[in-house]
Amino acid sequence: MAEFNAMDTAAFKGVWVFCEQREGQVQAISYQLLSEGRKLANDLGVELCGVVMGSEVNEDYLKALGGYGADRVYYIDNPLLKDYTTDGYAKVLCDLIMEKKPEIMLIGATNLGRDLGPRCAARLHTGLTADCTHLDVDVAKYKDFLRTTSNIDVDNTKFEENTNLKMTRPAFGGHLMATI
């Protein structure tokens, strides 16, 4: 199992999107996440990468990922990855993350993503936020978002100036939005 010791977070660069495929076809959630990932990558000035695992994935689908913003696509082609298995996909994805070190990893809130995401987070000793409705790394853009979606007095609230990912999701049955 992968393990981090005294992690140097400065070594982590880039935004990644796990691109789901079924029967060789990349799923629509992948394109949606790439579009969001592109915004984050632009704000951070880093590369956006798509990660596809499977076997015999249609090459046209892989090429299309660039049209949705991916600067690079990692395609792990192995017959053992043709159909999703929790342990197989988690091992391959975690190994790739340990090797390449992206700072942000986006995984869709699908059945597959809800299985894979927590397992990878646990193996990599990192956090996970599910069901996000807004993502931001730019504090000014985040303040603008809050002005239009909340009652927070943004101008009189102190915000730490950093590029940490701010993840907004529903809380308390959807009656409140929480940013993590």
Regions found by a protein language model. Give the residues of each.
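N-terminal glycine-rich FAD/FM-binding segment characteristic of electron-transfer flavoproteins
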Residues: 1-180
